[in-house]
Amino acid sequence: MRPDTSDFRELFLSGVAMLDVRAPLEFARGAFPGAVNLPLMDDAERHEVGLCYAQKGQQAAIELGHELVSGQRKAARIAAWAEFARAHPDGYLYCFRGGLRSQLVQQWLRDAGVDYPRVSGGYKAMRGFLIETIDTAAATQPWFVVGGLTGSGKTDVLADVPASIDLEGHARHRGSAFGRRALPQPPQIDFENALAIDVLHHLDAGWRALVVEDEGRFIGSRDVPQALSQRMQASPLVWLEAPFNARVERVLRDYVQGLAAEFIDTKGSAEGFAAYATRLREAMAAIAPRLGGARYGKLAALLDQALARQAESGEVALHRGWIEVLLRDYYDPMYDYQRAQREARIVFRGDRDAVTDWLLAHTARQGE
């Protein structure tokens, strides 16, 4: 039998399958990418056992747990765990603290002829390791931050630089009022866990520096871990430049054509387009107080005209109208001001090819 493990680094780097035996509610609050939830107790059973523990102590709670999970219910759960173990012979199981629940699952599997190791310390210890990974990387690793005006292609640059961490990808949000995607953002803990595992892989790869896109503390409603956010605000800034027309086309691609495709893929043609149109209108309305009444009215009318044409014929050209005004009169002045405030941090500026080449040269592994 393989031994239990507390080598969290190897667990996450290897990407082995993990069987989470916590209750569904615990799993929904935060989990690791790819982990499978096959609980020892469902939410109601866990609640009953928890009340019993508080009122009568541990032994009574254990006895109640055995009573609740017995007979066919117990047999079905053991069968599901055994099937997982056979499908993932290199995997591990865990509960919240690596205590009674995972030990019991391990024993029941052993009684059924299946030896399967568990993670010592459970979810709590692994979660602590991931938090420490981000904090340590923020404190000790060199970072570069890619900035630029809206539509300059910062995310495209990240895709070309292997040492980059895609915060917006992990947050499932493009980081502005118009940044919401068709699918909801992951829970905060899931965002942090996936981000930390990504950072761990990048540290293991040996890059001389890591690269992120310029972000505020929040990406949508997801909170960038404080240590990383503070490090980003103090790190060298690489400024990406792009012509205005190219930026308009990139916004059209990502925030109009791409977003419409996401919604249609998720909800179907008619319902998806309606949800996409609603999302754009909501985004415009969200910045109405900062636009002012007259400018908001103009932009909302341009957006409505563009959506009507798109619904009728699929043509997206009219969207350029509101995009151009929004960039020129709203986003560009805002980001120009922010850039001026941080001018001293800019260590390089250039177009996509120049910025990509510079980042590749300054993040390459030692000896490359």
Swiss-Prot record:
NCBIfam families hit by this protein: PRK11784.1-3, tRNA_sel_U_synt
Enzyme Commission number(s) of this protein: 2.9.1.3
Catalytic residue list: C95
Gene responsible for this protein: selU
Subunit and interaction comment: Monomer.
Annotated catalysed reactions: 5-methylaminomethyl-2-thiouridine(34) in tRNA + selenophosphate + (2E)-geranyl diphosphate + H2O + H(+) = 5-methylaminomethyl-2-selenouridine(34) in tRNA + (2E)-thiogeraniol + phosphate + diphosphate; 5-methylaminomethyl-2-thiouridine(34) in tRNA + (2E)-geranyl diphosphate = 5-methylaminomethyl-S-(2E)-geranyl-thiouridine(34) in tRNA + diphosphate; 5-methylaminomethyl-S-(2E)-geranyl-thiouridine(34) in tRNA + selenophosphate + H(+) = 5-methylaminomethyl-2-(Se-phospho)selenouridine(34) in tRNA + (2E)-thiogeraniol; 5-methylaminomethyl-2-(Se-phospho)selenouridine(34) in tRNA + H2O = 5-methylaminomethyl-2-selenouridine(34) in tRNA + phosphate
UniProt GO MF annotations: transferase activity, transferring alkyl or aryl (other than methyl) groups; tRNA 2-selenouridine synthase activity
Keywords: Selenium, Transferase
Function: Involved in the post-transcriptional modification of the uridine at the wobble position (U34) of tRNA(Lys), tRNA(Glu) and tRNA(Gln). Catalyzes the conversion of 2-thiouridine (S2U-RNA) to 2-selenouridine (Se2U-RNA). Acts in a two-step process involving geranylation of 2-thiouridine (S2U) to S-geranyl-2-thiouridine (geS2U) and subsequent selenation of the latter derivative to 2-selenouridine (Se2U) in the tRNA chain.
A Gene Ontology biological process term: tRNA wobble uridine modification
InterPro entries in the cross-refs: Rhodanese-like_dom, Rhodanese-like_dom_sf, SelU
Family matches, as SUPFAM superfamilies: Rhodanese/Cell cycle control phosphatase
Domain Rhodanese span(s) in chain numbering: 12-135
Family, per entry: Belongs to the SelU family.
Entries under Gene3D superfamilies matching the protein: Rhodanese-like domain (3.40.250.10)
Protein name as catalogued: tRNA 2-selenouridine synthase
Record has Transferase as a keyword: yes
